[in-house]
């Protein structure tokens, strides 16, 4: 079995290859549609000829569309392509914004000043771009009056409507009632 040495000086941009792409002698079809190293269409050629062209160019023959009839192969430096794809993935992960969920706990019988303080905390979290999980904790006989919790959560949602939207409606879960608020996107307001 012949091993191909890879040396490349070409960039391969805009080609999506799955993680299990077959290369060089692992491609087991009689003929392929060949794309050259610069993106030019070579046409349908026998697999031996395609491997020879790739070997002569010191590049790899990579199967980019295995389900096509015949499969599409491209001549490229596979090692360099994998490295650039990993760099792009790392860069996109770095640029992703981490969503943080803050939690604010309330009681059904909350005083006005305490409510204002909790509401201001929720507004501050939403302005920073965090999601907020608002939890109302019921104790004892308070559990028999879930409508108090629903009213309190609706009041809070209306008070912070300029800063956040309700992502998950109020729902009761045992002794607690929860609602999730998300920040208002800057493009929508």
Curated annotation (Swiss-Prot):
GTP-binding among keywords: no
Annotated GO biological process: ribosome disassembly
Keyword Protein biosynthesis part of the UniProt annotation: yes
Entries under Gene3D superfamilies matching the protein: Translation initiation factor 3 (IF-3), C-terminal domain, Translation initiation factor 3 (IF-3), N-terminal domain
A GO-annotated cellular component: membrane
Compartment(s) where it occurs, according to its Swiss-Prot or TrEMBL record: Cytoplasm
UniProt-listed InterPro entries: T_IF-3_C_sf, T_IF-3_N_sf, Translation_initiation_fac3_CS, Translation_initiation_fac_3, Translation_initiation_fac_3_C, Translation_initiation_fac_3_N
Keywords: Cytoplasm, Initiation factor, Protein biosynthesis
SUPFAM superfamilies cross-referenced by the UniProt entry: Translation initiation factor IF3, C-terminal domain, Translation initiation factor IF3, N-terminal domain
Any one Gene Ontology molecular-function term assigned to this protein's record: translation initiation factor activity
One Pfam family cited in the UniProt record for this chain: IF3_N
Assembly: Monomer.
Protein family per UniProt: Belongs to the IF-3 family.
Name used for this protein in its record: Translation initiation factor IF-3
Native source organism of the sequence: Corynebacterium glutamicum (strain R)
